[in-house]
Amino acid sequence: MKAAIIGAGNMGGAIARGLAKGTIIPAGNIIVSNPTQGKLDKLKAEFPALQVTNDNQEAAAGADMIIFAVKPWLMEPVIKELEL
């Protein structure tokens, strides 16, 4: 199973860390996208197997599960930009 997490703020980062520490989805099968590179770098430093990107479409492509961890007012534009 491959998981994409859109957003690496407090919520998205916590979800990514929890999944990466778990055994259900290998960390290498988790991709996190965020517009701020610093948050992605921090996650990658903690869990080197995590995949990170600034491109939401890249993160969502091929994912079996997409977790949206963005502010409510950003949800619609983020979903619209994805070609699902």
How should each PLM-predicted stretch be described?
Residues 51-84:
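Rossmann-fold NAD(P) dinucleotide-binding segment
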Residues 1-47, 51-54, 58-61:
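NAD(P)+-binding Rossmann beta1-loop-alpha1 motif at the extreme N-terminus of oxidoreductases
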